[in-house]
């Protein structure tokens, strides 16, 4: 069976790994030059993604097409005919859509001293893991873009991601850290991490970030 996977991020690679394990032929279409998706932009995840992708990279049943853009999809009998913007035509028995996500852009909070989590990661990454000297007081605001009138659902990731950012920060420096949250929704050992961070002086303040 020929399986076409749209998206070469962690979801697409995970799907490819399963399909290859079942001896199917797999083609991954990635809109950027290299697979990685959002994880490739997160310094602390990049190595882990590379290791994960390396497990299937040389599989003879796998084809990865970078800078791919789909312009047309037709259903023919039981197969899909896919045309790319460079004129290349592909045929697949199954299509998996793993097109990733678009990070929320908090325009209402924009400012010189306001960073999204991805931007914060990039700052540390560019400095080879060092925290800028003027980052001596840091506030993490949770639920930005969710738990609001327009989007009332919990993102289910920002609490865990913030704990990771706090841990990563404290491994590099000892700034004053305050976490502002609506509700804390952790998983497993993250509850113990929260207590450990509180014990080291990290402040957790219930607040409304909407």
Q: Which residue stretches match the model-derived regions?
A:
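Electropositive phosphate-/nucleotide-binding environments in soluble metabolic enzymes
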Residues: 10-13, 46-50, 67, 89, ...
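Short secondary-structure boundary/capping segments
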Residues: 42-45, 110-112, 193-196
